[in-house]
Structure formats: C-alpha cells, structure tokens
Amino acid sequence: MDKNKAVINFLLSCDYVRNSPLFYTLGQVEADNKQVVTLANDVSVNTPYIDGSVKKRYTFTLIDYQTVTPNAVITREVDNTNVPVSENLDNAFKVQQVADWVTEQSDLRRYPDFGSDCVIDDMVVVTDQPNLNGVDRAVTPVLAKYSISIRIDYIDYSKAIWK
C-alpha cells in the first residue's frame, strides 16, 4: 500500500479536512485549503529485528491556510461570562480540531491503512497546538499558514522471514 495515499485517505475521513480542498506536496494558497507535505523519514529510527522486520517512521505535515485580520481580540458577554471573540482565534481553533481528531483516532487505534505488511504502533501529533509558520500579506484576504506535524511509527514485515 502506498503510504502517501493511505495518509490522504485517512485525513479525508476527518469532516473538517474532507470539506475543504486537500492537496499533496503542492497546492493553491487560498483560504481553507489544506496541503500534505511528507518529511524526510528518520532512517536512524529504522531498527531491524532478527526476523527481518524493520521498525520505521513516517512523518508528514498538514498545512492549513486560514484568513487572518489585524483586529484586536474583543470580549462579549455570554451567559454572564466574558468570552474572547476573534476571527484569528476561531481559525486557529479549526486547525486545532484536526490535531485533536488525529489524537482521538490514535487513542482508538484507528490508523491509516499501510497494508498487510505493516503494523502501526503509534501515531502522534508532534506539537500540542498548531504552528503559525507565517502570514502572507501579499494576498487578499491576508492568509496565515498553520501547520501540524504527525508522526507514525510502524513495523514493516515485508521482508520478515516468518509472520
């Protein structure tokens, strides 16, 4: 199984991702577009076992473009409580929801399908909140580039001498 396609299929099962354009490696920089970029896999993690199987790591980043405004955070009273209101806070929260969804899937042991020769041990979001990688003021509307990185550790049994 192609691991890149498996990750795309997995992400498309998340409502927030499925309802927006998703690109692989290269995409259009527009509000609400998402992009999957694979990272160089850490070969130092490759641990061969006596049966021929190998522990490996697959890491990717999900980039999410969201609109941003220079407006200050304001508060509104809701049910006798002051609640912060900000488009920027709301948009960052959208990206956080994907990170939370991935963590929830991992807790339930629902992983991308890497095929019958691979068994996923763990899937983690590398940071506890999205990274803000920059703001593009050259476009209208102004866009923020948020990202979350996800690491998948798995055992590759494709060369194992017994299974």
Predicted segments, located by residue:
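Charged, amphipathic alpha-helical segments and their flanking helix caps
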Residues: 1-25, 44-163
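Short secondary-structure junction/hinge motifs that connect adjacent elements
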Residues: 23-34
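Charged, often glycine-rich, active-site loop that binds/positions anionic groups
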Residues: 32-42
